[in-house]
């Protein structure tokens, strides 16, 4: 499912990150009294009355004359976020009034001609809010709306109006049940475009070009050996009609949108530089959203000797510890080395992502684990796992019914996942483990 984007913009220290935490019901956004704490944009899945959208938190926008060395980059990224958005939330500080910085942001927002809500934050006294709103009409971006991000005042009515303006989902996730959606993701210049072109070369039948949900991205539907693949195109980063271009930002946004729509993510890594922090972030996004993951070490032919090859694999081991189960393939998109193997790896990863394990198979594993005797306790209580069942797929999700959920540590979760992966074939796909409390008759005594 492709989620529409809602961008939050404003000058520094008006409460944008607090509002993000309120709307997305998370504490991931860093909140601090100092200016400029949020320098990079961050992404959060939010839900209001069953309608999901992607909330983008941007850094504080400062005037072009600012002495802050990050100001230009932050401004560029905030504008890029606003350009990608279906709805803009422009946040100002009601306790301070209109500032020159607010007016600068307002000029930027007005030029975009997007649906915009002007949110006057930090109005924690509803009885006095009308007295504080009138001066914000001068910004020329519509009627000011009083909110308190800290206490939640006004946010419910706001979200009702926001979701009413969001475009309907394209529905491509469910309209093509026999088509496998594949996203080619990764940082700029890793070789995504070359790989994309090589994969859909002359020996394939290109059925159609379909406009994707991201502006000016094209999805290509390919038929190969009787199977259909929808290649979610993030390979080409097209130029925007604005001088505020930020290639890394657009790459990240398009990768994010592609991941939301994909069954399998192909993470293209430039082997000449190894796995970077941005590769790590993109891999994490794919895992969080439940994509099967295939890591393609591109430009392998440029590595000169075993020493360089070992150094690259060291970055893989160090940076991609969150996905030891991922499939890896050494390729050259330029020469075509091993590119033909990608299709079989995509098929296998997608099949495992859709795996169904019977309850009897799962509980046989649980019996083996009990007999092995590995469990956890807090000295007074001992964890007992009564039974387990599969409760979802794409990716596979399993619910364990236990006596005390608070005894389940992260280490024990990893132990269970490792045992499950050793027993069942989940190569290439994440799995989800959930734990619910269920006391046996003996526990109740």
What function would you assign to each model-found segment?
Residues 183, 343-350, 355-416:
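Long, well-ordered amphipathic alpha-helical subdomains in the mid-to-C-terminal portions
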Residues 35-37, 60-62, 95-97, 122-127, ...:
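Conserved nucleotide-binding/hydrolysis micro-motifs of P-loop NTPases
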Residues 215, 220-296, 301-304, 311:
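Acidic, glycine-rich loop-and-beta core segments that form the ion-binding/anion-interacting portion
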Residues 115-117, 124-174, 292, 301-357:
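Canonical P-loop GTPase G-domain recognition
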Residues 425-440:
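A short amphipathic beta-strand at an alpha->beta junction
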Residues 37-40, 53, 59-86, 91-108, ...:
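Switch II of P-loop NTPase G domains
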Residues 316, 412-426:
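Short, non-transmembrane amphipathic alpha-helical segments
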Residues 1-69, 167-252, 256-259:
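Conserved G1/Walker A P-loop phosphate-binding module
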């Amino acid at each position: 499912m492709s989620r529409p984007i809602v961008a939050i913009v404003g000058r520094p220290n008006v409460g944008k990150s607090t509002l993000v935490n309120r709307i997305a019901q998370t504490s991931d956004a860093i909140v601090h009294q100092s200016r400029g704490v949020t320098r990079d944009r961050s992404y959060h899945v939010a839900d209001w009355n069953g309608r999901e959208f992607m909330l983008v938190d941007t850094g504080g926008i400062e005037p072009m004359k600012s002495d802050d060395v990050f100001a230009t980059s932050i401004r560029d990224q905030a504008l890029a976020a606003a350009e990608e958005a279906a709805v803009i939330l422009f946040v100002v500080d009601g306790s301070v009034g209109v500032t020159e910085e607010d007016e600068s942001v307002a000029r930027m927002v007005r030029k975009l001609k997007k649906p915009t809500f002007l949110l006057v934050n930090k109005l924690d006294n509803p009885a006095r809010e009308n007295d504080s709103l009138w001066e914000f009409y001068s910004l020329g971006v519509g009627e000011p709306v009083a909110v308190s991000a800290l206490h939640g005042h006004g946010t419910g009515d706001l979200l009702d109006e926001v979701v009413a303006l969001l475009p309907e989902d394209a529905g491509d996730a469910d309209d093509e049940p026999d088509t496998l959606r594949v996203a080619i993701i990764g940082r700029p210049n890793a070789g995504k475009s070359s790989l994309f072109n090589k994969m859909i070369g002359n020996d394939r039948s290109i059925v159609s070009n379909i406009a994707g949900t991201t502006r000016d991205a094209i999805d290509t539907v390919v038929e190969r050996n009787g199977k259909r693949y929808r290649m979610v195109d993030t390979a080409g980063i097209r130029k925007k009609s604005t001088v505020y271009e930020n290639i890394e930002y657009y790459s990240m946004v398009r990768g994010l949108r592609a991941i939301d729509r994909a069954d399998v993510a192909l993470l293209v890594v430039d082997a000449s530089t190894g796995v970077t922090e941005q590769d790590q972030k993109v891999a994490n996004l794919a895992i969080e959203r439940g994509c099967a993951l295939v890591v393609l070490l591109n430009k392998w032919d440029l590595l000169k000797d075993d020493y360089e090859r070992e150094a690259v694999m060291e970055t893989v081991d160090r940076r991609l510890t969150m996905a030891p189960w991922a499939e890896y393939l050494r390729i050259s998109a330029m020469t075509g080395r091993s590119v033909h193997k990608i299709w079989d790896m995509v098929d296998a990863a997608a099949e495992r992502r859709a795996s169904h394990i019977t309850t009897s198979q799962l509980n046989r594993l649980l019996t083996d684990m009990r007999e092995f005797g590995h469990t956890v306790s807090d000295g007074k209580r001992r964890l007992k796992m009564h039974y387990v069942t599969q409760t979802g797929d794409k990716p596979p999700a399993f619910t364990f019914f236990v006596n005390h959920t608070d005894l389940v540590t992260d280490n024990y979760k990893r132990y269970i996942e490792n045992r499950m992966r050793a027993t069942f074939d989940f190569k290439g796909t994440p799995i989800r483990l959930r734990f619910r409390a269920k006391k046996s008759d003996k526990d109740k005594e």
